[in-house]
């Protein structure tokens, strides 16, 4: 019998021991739900009537998640610029390609920008995706200024009447201020040609608690408007709670 089934069975009989509560707490924390939120869940369950325990948990967990409905794919009659950001290895390039593929299904004219000019084969990876979708792509020389690539792409997208510009950026540690400043420069340069409509932070959900620190710092640096969560697990709830309403 699963942990929660045992819990709900025990609640209905009014017989949850102190050791069982400790086990439940440890299991939830190990699932990366976060200490604060785990304690809130347990308190809600303890204070609920036995028959209301399931509803108490689901209602409380849902309250941590945003219920604000928002369409990511904006006004297709104008240029929409979407910047993809995040630390190394989270899946930014693949996520960029998936977004591009989704947009082309609605007959939108999409341009990709390979602004990750530092990672080996990053440009080639995005070029491969661009060829498969297919969509056009703007690239730069290896180790060239990412802001320059972004600006060239923004110029092309604006003058050639693209509906969407998706910019894949280099992975950067959120603890490196110089790299975060460089990302801010990319945003400033793009806005000379067109407003940045969305800044999407890609987070590998298996990073656990560190995902919160990543989210907070990227929000402060460039004003994140949304998240792409890869390798999804309970971390989504934990990250979502302190970063609402993003």
For each feature predicted by the language model, list its residue ranges.
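Conserved ATPase-coupling elements of RecA-like P-loop NTPase cores
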Residues: 122-124, 174-180, 211-212
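Inter-motif core of Ras-like GTPase G domains
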Residues: 181-205
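Conserved beta-strand/loop subsegment of P-loop NTPase cores
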Residues: 111, 166, 195-203, 220-233, ...
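Single conserved hydrophobic/aromatic residue that forms the stacking wall/gate
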Residues: 238-246
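Active-site/ligand-binding-proximal alpha/beta "capping" segment
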Residues: 186-188, 211-228
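Conserved nucleotide-binding/hydrolysis micro-motifs of P-loop NTPases
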Residues: 79, 117-120, 143-145, 171-174, ...
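Primarily NTPase-proximal linker/entry elements flanking Walker-type ATP/GTP-binding cores
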Residues: 3-115, 121-143, 147-158, 162-167
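Short beta-alpha junctions and helix-cap segments that line functional grooves
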Residues: 99, 213-214, 240
């Amino acid at each position: 019998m699963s942990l929660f089934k045992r819990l709900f069975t025990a609640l209905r009989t009014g017989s949850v021991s102190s050791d069982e509560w400790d086990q439940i707490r440890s299991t939830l924390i190990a699932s990366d739900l976060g200490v604060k939120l785990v304690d809130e869940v347990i308190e809600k369950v303890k204070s609920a009537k036995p028959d209301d325990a399931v509803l108490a948990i689901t209602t409380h967990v849902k309250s941590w998640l945003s219920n604000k409905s928002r369409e990511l794919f904006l006004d297709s009659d104008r240029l929409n610029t979407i910047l993809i950001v995040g630390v190394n290895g989270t899946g930014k390039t693949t996520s960029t390609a998936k977004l591009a593929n989704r947009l082309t299904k609605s007959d939108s004219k999409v341009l990709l920008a390979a602004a990750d000019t530092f990672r080996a084969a990053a440009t080639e990876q995005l070029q491969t995706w661009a060829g498969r979708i297919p969509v056009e792509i703007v690239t730069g020389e290896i180790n060239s200024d990412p802001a320059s690539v972004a600006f060239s792409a923004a110029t092309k997208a604006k003058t050639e009447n693209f509906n969407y510009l998706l910019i894949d950026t280099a992975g950067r540690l959120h603890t490196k201020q110089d790299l975060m400043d460089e990302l801010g420069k990319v945003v400033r340069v793009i806005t000379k040609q067109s407003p940045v409509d969305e800044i999407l932070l890609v987070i590998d959900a298996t990073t656990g608690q560190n995902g919160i620190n990543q989210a907070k710092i990227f929000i402060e640096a460039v004003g994140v408007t949304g998240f792409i969560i890869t390798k999804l697990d309970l971390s989504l709830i934990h990250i979502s709670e302190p970063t609402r309403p993003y």
